[in-house]
Amino acid sequence: METATLVAIFISCLLVSFTGYAPYTASGQPSNELRDLFEEHED
């Protein structure tokens, strides 16, 4: 394959993996470690 095709496939895979990892971090198993800043600073 040509170099441009491989670069396009590589960038596409990076975008898809980041798009899948972001919701997993926000609502999956690692979200238990996130802090709620609004609960920490109640006035």
Swiss-Prot record:
InterPro entries (alphabetical): PSII_PsbN
Membrane-spanning segments: 5-27
Domain of life: Eukaryota
Signal sequence extent: none
Record's subcellular location: Plastid, Chloroplast thylakoid membrane
Topology class, membrane: Single-pass membrane protein
Cellular component annotations (GO), alphabetically ordered: chloroplast thylakoid membrane
UniProt GO BP: photosynthesis
Keyword terms of this UniProt record: Chloroplast, Membrane, Plastid, Thylakoid, Transmembrane, Transmembrane helix
Role description: May play a role in photosystem I and II biogenesis.
The family this protein is said to belong to: Belongs to the PsbN family.
Identification of the protein by name: Protein PsbN
Gene source species: Anthoceros angustus (Hornwort)
